[in-house]
């Protein structure tokens, strides 16, 4: 069967990674080298994790729900350190279980997804939220008005990324679309621009457009898995 031969990897890259907009992530050079000097070394590992995750999903006839709720991933020592996970040593890739208890699990916890939907120096709740809305849920937003001001690449002093976005999104002509996508992104603010969990707690509580209150990746995953899939 095709799902048990080398073509499975091509399916993982050409279908799954293409669908998630992470194909070719191992060549990504969008991050600020001064802020994230480790990124150039890690991006290949981050991409390999995603490919192996999808290879495993296909080989085991995983469901759409497994995309969100999978409790395992594949790590080597270098990527495990980025994730703050002990017990993985060397270059050999290992299947690691219990990812939900470690604050990750499924595609929402993949560093490729979190990093590709961030800026060079800061996170982007708008990009992350739009990715959930359009890529995972298959919804579509109208194009933003042409005269919308660009957000700064770095967060101004005294503001968090969330506060910056909330200020931007309060503009009346922008609010209608942003209320649909931004809350999904706010729920993922515990992760920095390269998909690493922040050392300090971040407010990830948010209210979706339909009034549902969620908190963090766990709350977002539960909502998507039970209400939207």
Region locations from a protein language model:
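A cross-family structural signal marking well-folded subdomains
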Residues: 1-131, 142
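Sequence context surrounding c-type heme c attachment/ligation sites in exported
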Residues: 77-80, 95-227
């Amino acid at each position: 069967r095709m799902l048990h031969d080398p073509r499975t990897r091509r399916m993982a890259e050409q279908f799954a990674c293409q669908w998630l907009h992470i194909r070719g992530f191992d060549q990504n050079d969008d991050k600020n080298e001064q802020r994230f000097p480790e990124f150039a070394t890690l991006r290949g590992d981050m991409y390999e994790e995603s490919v192996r995750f999808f290879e495993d999903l296909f080989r085991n006839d995983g469901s759409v729900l497994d995309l969100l709720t999978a409790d395992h991933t594949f790590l080597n020592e270098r990527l495990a350190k980025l994730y703050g996970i002990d017990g993985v040593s060397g270059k050999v890739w290992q299947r690691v279980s219990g990812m939900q208890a470690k604050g990750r699990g499924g595609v929402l916890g993949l560093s490729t997804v979190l990093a590709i939907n961030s800026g060079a120096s800061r996170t982007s709740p708008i990009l992350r939220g739009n990715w959930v809305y359009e890529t995972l849920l298959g919804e579509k937003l109208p194009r933003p008005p042409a005269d919308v001001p660009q957000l700064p690449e770095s967060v101004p002093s005294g503001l968090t990324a969330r506060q910056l976005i909330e200020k931007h999104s309060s503009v009346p002509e922008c609010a209608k679309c942003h209320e649909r996508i931004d809350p999904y992104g706010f729920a993922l603010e515990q992760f920095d621009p390269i998909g690493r969990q922040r050392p300090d707690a971040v407010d990830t509580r948010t209210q979706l457009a339909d009034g549902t209150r969620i908190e963090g990746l766990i709350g977002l995953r539960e909502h998507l898995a039970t209400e939207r899939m």
